[in-house]
From Swiss-Prot:
It comes from Dictyostelium discoideum (Social amoeba). Belongs to the NDRG family. It comes from the Eukaryota. InterPro entries: AB_hydrolase_fold, NDRG. This is NDRG-like protein.
Amino acid sequence: MSSLNKSIGSVTESPINVVVHNYDNNDPTETRHEVQTKHGKLVCFQKIGSNQSPNMPTIISYHDLGLNHTTCFSPFFNHPNMNHILPYLNIIHIEAPGHEFNAETIPSSQYPSITEMAEDIQYVLDYFKVKVFIGLGAGAGGCILTQYSIFYPRSVVGLVLVGSVIKSFSWLDWVKSWVELTTLPSLKNPTGVRKYLIDHYYADNLEETNPDLLEIIKKEMVLINPDNLYHYVHSFVKRDDIKEEQIKALGCKILLVVGKDSTYKEDIIDLFSQFNPRNSTILQVPDCGILVTAEKPGDIVEPFKLFMQGIGFLLDYYQSHDDAQK
């Protein structure tokens, strides 16, 4: 088991530029797909690298609460230091149910649980004819991808979990969150749901370190159907516990990423201790909260590249990139 503490922590990130969009997809390089699953429709966005290699690795991302794939992952994938490897990747972003722009409200009785969302990933793989993939999950999205990897271990060769607390809440935390959540008037006052998310997940760090990014998250959150946003939070709070023996049994390579200023840092470090020490690594990013992919994307680009190389991908990239440098 290894731990990476950022040696480039003194490097200052340039301001994050996340385009707040008011239409379905603002990236012309992404293609929108609708996948029918057992529990309803999933909207996915695919970005295929220009290399077109038959061995091109597939990255499947799943975003955190209150976000969509644009807010959560575009600062990372659009970072200048990622330009050299994007041609070598097949990226599929899964939007949580009903989190695409202009989505219809999903009735609470039909909104899937975290376990059901994990099961529905198999429909995405079948649709895109993907056999194996590397999962990139932020927060709740990491829980979903981890649960899927327990169900279908042969399909997952690597997991990058960013700020993800996999274990369910303790009884006391569950009651506290449940009381707070059930008092939110989701239908009459959608701002209550958004305020809950901002206060509990992002404001503690971003108000001081990156207020512009916090404003972007708030504006983007308004574009998500408020009832579906509430349902996603509700499913996360009520998620089934993943047992310690299930976590230890994970056979894929795992990179756990946590911001050192995150409220949940200790929980994530405790989670790291439960992974198999032979295939897990933790990366602690200084001066950063829970949303590392947006706050400090440049700090995780190189560890991500090395992680991919360690599981046998991007070897052509390294060879060609080294040749170009020479």
